[in-house]
Amino acid sequence: MINSIKTLLLIATLAILSACGWHFQQSVTMPSEWRTLALESDDSYNDFTVIMRRKLQENQVNVVNLEQNIPILRINKQITSDQVASIFKHGREAEKLLMLEVEATFRLANGESYPINAKVNRTFFDNARAALAKSEEREVIWNDMREQVARQLIVKIIALQNQIKRK
């Protein structure tokens, strides 16, 4: 009897959670005073800057041109590298470790600057027999890594608000 009640309670809980649309960390919200900011980069049309702009807009942030009295997110440096992670018996590369690191600065409207950075690592199977598929897969992985780093930067900006409030 008790086991059937536990099972029924578990099924009811799962049904309620899946029916109401509740998800773990689906999205995060930017503080209201930072809902308008400028995105600054050396190359405003490179892949990462475009993805960062899109991710900010998905989080209801209005990205504007450089103005006075608004926060600025400056992308300082984007570092990409790949290292051999494993090799085949005959000495060819089998697997690579792809790394993407972005260093940025978040400057508040009052002029205070806070450095933030994010880093993502992925492995990539380097199949020499499928050269075209390999390059396409590699580009998909790099784009996914850029999106993940952009999400990490947004989360760190939101966490920065709590750090500033504690001062």
From Swiss-Prot:
Q: Where is the lipid attached (N-palmitoyl cysteine)?
A: 20
The GO cellular component terms are: cell outer membrane; transporter complex
Give an example GO molecular function.
Answer: lipopolysaccharide binding
Localization in the cell? Cell outer membrane
Lipid moiety-binding region for S-diacylglycerol cysteine? 20
Cysteines engaged in disulfide bonds, as pairs? none
Q: Which keywords fit this entry according to its UniProt record? A: Cell outer membrane, Lipoprotein, Membrane, Palmitate, Signal
Known InterPro entries for this protein?
LPS_assembly_LptE (IPR007485)
**Is Nucleus among the key words of this record?**
no
Q: For this entry, list what GO says about its biological process.
A: Gram-negative-bacterium-type cell outer membrane assembly; lipopolysaccharide transport
Q: How does it sit in the membrane?
A: Lipid-anchor
Which stretch is the leader sequence? 1-19
What Pfam families does UniProt report for this protein, alphabetically? LptE
Protein function: Together with LptD, is involved in the assembly of lipopolysaccharide (LPS) at the surface of the outer membrane. Required for the proper assembly of LptD. Binds LPS and may serve as the LPS recognition site at the outer membrane.
Q: Which family does it belong to?
A: Belongs to the LptE lipoprotein family.
Assembly and interactions?
A: Component of the lipopolysaccharide transport and assembly complex. Interacts with LptD.
Q: What is the protein name given in its UniProt record? A: LPS-assembly lipoprotein LptE
Organism encoding this protein: Haemophilus influenzae (strain ATCC 51907 / DSM 11121 / KW20 / Rd)
User: Which taxonomic lineage does the organism of this UniProt entry have?
Assistant: Bacteria, Pseudomonadati, Pseudomonadota, Gammaproteobacteria, Pasteurellales
